[in-house]
Amino acid sequence: VTGKEAWKMRIIALVPAVLAAAVLLVSTTASAAPGNIGFGFNARDISGFPTGAASLTGGGSYNPVTGFVKSAGGFRCTSDVGQGPLAGCLSGEGVRWDTVELRRSTTFKCTGSAAEPLKTATTDENTVVLLADFYRAGDGNDESFTAQMIVSADDIAPDIAGIQNVWIQGVGCASAIANFSS
């Protein structure tokens, strides 16, 4: 066996070991990182702050471990909003929203009242906290407003009567039809 042939035999002998190690590494990484979580929701009459109300619908997918998010939907102000990030959104305005980023958590209030305790929502397999851009028809592809929002399969404000599982910053909370799957 010449030097060249011996070298080829060593490479051929190592190929199965390298492939086995690669498969093991990929499968370990895949099992350690959970997959994306899908969600969809429909919320009407989001309100609670002194002025304003909105409807919000949409969905997408996110991964709380990696920070991946891709989600969007429709929105409309159903009553003039006079405070917070959506201040100036008039009744009947609003077309769509899309995601700026996935947030690990946020603090929020459903009513904006000083007496209401501050609550915290955390992104997990049943709750998604987003920073989103909201668009009005006349503004084209330039976002009209940027605000945080929460969608959850669970009640995010058990201190308030009824189920509150969606929130828009500066507008309030509402009960939504919400589904999450992983």
Language-model features, listed with the residues they occupy:
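Mobile, glycine-rich extracellular loop/lid and propeptide segments
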Residues: I11-A13
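An exposed acidic His-Trp-rich patch
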Residues: V81-Y135
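Short, Lys/Arg-enriched N-terminal segments with co-localized hydrophobic residues
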Residues: V1-K8
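Bacterial N-terminal signal peptides
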Residues: V15-V26
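N-terminal segment immediately downstream of the Sec signal-peptide cleavage site
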Residues: A30-R96, E101, I163-S182
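Basic/polar N-terminal segments that are highly enriched at the extreme N-terminus
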Residues: V1, V26-A33
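Extracytosolic low-complexity repeat regions of secreted or lipid-anchored proteins
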Residues: S113-G172
